[in-house]
Amino acid sequence: MVYFQGGGSIRFAVGFVAGLLLRETAQRKSKKPPRTLLVPARRDQKDGEMILVRQLEAEDFDKGFMELLAQLTSAGNVNREQWQARFAETRHGPEFVFVVEENGRLLASGTLVLERKFARGCGLCGHIEDIVVDKQCRGRGMGLVIVTALTRVAERMGCYKVILDCSEENQPFYEKCEFKRKEVQMARYFRD
């Protein structure tokens, strides 16, 4: 334990500690996700094929990103202008979209949303959303690749946990990705 004598020393110590805390907070907030990651093609492999997973790029509109997303959910009718505006919003978080591309075609995509909490010492929680693999590529392990990549990014960003919602039929897949069933999701939609 350190003891300080005199008011000047205490003010200095408080200022010094406050400065350290501000610097730590700035460093934590300035963490950026990687632009690209290499992920093993299969979970159990040590060496071998690696898949490049990268952040979404503006050009992905022309590579069929919205069509890929439509294989998962209602993607809506998004024009180039809407795409560019939404893409610009995602550049600095708190959500980050990653894709797998092969020969100019998007094979898989997923989103990591970062939530700053009061819990866990103002910790960071990652939410995995919108996991989709192109119908023609299913069964090749691309789902595992994209989930693995998003999980790594969440850990690198300092998340204390990463969570996701899935259907009952997809639960076995996410268990292969080392997720465990916990609690129940509730939803209230305001429009289709």
Name each region found by the language model.
Residues 51, 104-109, 126:
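Glycine-rich phosphate/pyrophosphate-binding loop shared by adenosine-nucleotide-utilizing enzymes
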Residues 2-29:
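Terminal signal-anchor or tail-anchor transmembrane helices
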Residues 99, 105-114, 132:
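Conserved beta-strand in the GNAT
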Residues 88-99, 127, 185:
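A short helix-loop-beta-strand connector motif used in the catalytic cores of GNAT acetyltransferases and
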Residues 147, 154-166:
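Conserved GNAT acetyl-CoA-binding A-motif
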Residues 133, 139-152:
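Conserved acetyl-CoA-binding loop-helix of GNAT-fold acetyltransferases
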